[in-house]
C-alpha cells in the first residue's frame, strides 16, 4: 500500500500528537539535515538574509521539507558556490500523522470493522506551521541575494498553500538590524557567537570589570 497523499493531512484540526512512550512505532522523518552549506562561518561572513515565510496555517510533511531543502541547496551550490551560503530549515516535523488502513480486496467486509476503533497507526510526521512563520532561511553576502531569492522561489513549489519571500533587515540570523549591528560592533558592545551575536551589557560582578568599565556611559545607556 502506497503512502497516502499529504493533501489529506494539510489542515490543522486536532491537538499536537508528538512521539512519546504512548505513541510508539513512529517512522523516522524524511528530513534529517537542517543546516546546509557553510554552517560554521562566523556571523560577520554572511550579513544578508532571505526568508521563506508561510502565509497559511497548515501541516507541512517531512517529505516536503526535505524536497525543499534539496531544491534550495542544489540551486545555491550551482549558482552561488558551495562556500557562499548557509541554509537553515526553521521548522521541525514533530507532529505524528495516523492512518486507519482499509482493505479493498474481495471479502474485506468480513476482515475489518470499518469506523469502529478508527484511531489509526502512525504513518509519518509533519510540522504544524502558522501564518507568518519562517520555513527556510538563507544567509549569504549581498552579492548573492538574487540567487538566494531564486533558490527559495524554487523551494516554494515543494510546499502546499501560499508562501512569501522576504528580504530581512536583520544581520544574518541575528536579532539586530544591519545598522544596529554595525554601530554596536564599532562601539565594541557586541561579541560573535558562532552564527549569532551576543550583546555585552553592564551587568555582572563589578570586581571582575576593568577599571573605568564598571558602568556604561550615559550616552550609551540612553541609546540602549
Swiss-Prot record:
Keyword terms: Ribonucleoprotein, Ribosomal protein
A GO biological process held by the record: translation
Domain of life: Eukaryota
Gene Ontology molecular functions: structural constituent of ribosome
Pfam family, one: Ribosomal_L16
GO cellular component: ribonucleoprotein complex; ribosome
CDD domains, per the entry: Ribosomal_L16_L10e (cd01433)
Similarity field: Belongs to the universal ribosomal protein uL16 family.
PANTHER family: 60S RIBOSOMAL PROTEIN L10 (PTHR11726)
Oligomer and partners: Component of the small ribosomal subunit. Mature ribosomes consist of a small (40S) and a large (60S) subunit. The 40S subunit contains about 33 different proteins and 1 molecule of RNA (18S). The 60S subunit contains about 49 different proteins and 3 molecules of RNA (25S, 5.8S and 5S).
Descriptive protein name: Large ribosomal subunit protein uL16z
Biological classification of the source: Eukaryota, Viridiplantae, Streptophyta, Embryophyta, Tracheophyta
Amino acid at each position: 500500500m502506497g503512502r497516502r497523499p499529504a493533501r489529506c493531512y494539510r489542515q490543522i484540526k486536532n491537538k499536537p500528537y508528538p512521539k512519546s512512550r504512548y505513541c510508539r512505532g513512529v517512522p523516522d522523518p524524511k528530513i534529517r539535515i537542517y543546516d546546509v552549506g557553510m554552517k560554521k562561518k562566523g556571523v560577520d561572513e554572511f550579513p544578508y538574509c532571505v526568508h521563506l515565510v508561510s502565509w497559511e496555517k497548515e501541516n507541512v510533511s517531512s517529505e516536503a521539507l526535505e524536497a525543499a531543502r534539496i531544491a534550495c541547496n542544489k540551486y545555491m551550490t550551482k549558482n552561488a558556490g558551495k562556500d557562499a551560503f548557509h541554509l537553515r530549515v526553521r521548522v521541525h516535523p514533530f507532529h505524528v500523522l495516523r492512518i486507519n488502513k482499509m482493505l479493498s480486496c474481495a471479502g474485506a467486509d468480513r476482515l475489518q470493522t470499518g469506523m469502529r476503533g478508527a484511531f489509526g497507526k502512525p504513518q509519518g510526521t509533519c510540522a504544524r506551521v502558522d501564518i507568518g512563520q519562517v520555513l527556510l532561511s538563507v544567509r549569504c553576502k549581498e552579492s548573492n541575494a538574487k540567487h538566494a531569492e531564486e533558490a527559495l522561489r524554487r523551494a516554494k513549489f515543494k510546499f502546499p498553500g501560499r508562501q512569501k519571500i522576504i528580504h530581512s533587515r536583520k544581520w544574518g540570523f541575528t536579532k539586530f538590524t544591519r545598522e544596529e549591528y554595525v554601530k554596536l560592533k564599532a562601539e565594541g558592545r557586541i561579541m560573535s557567537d558562532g552564527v549569532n551575536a551576543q550583546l555585552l551589557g553592564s551587568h555582572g560582578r563589578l570586581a571582575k570589570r576593568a577599571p573605568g568599565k564598571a558602568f556604561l556611559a550615559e550616552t550609551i545607556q540612553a541609546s540602549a
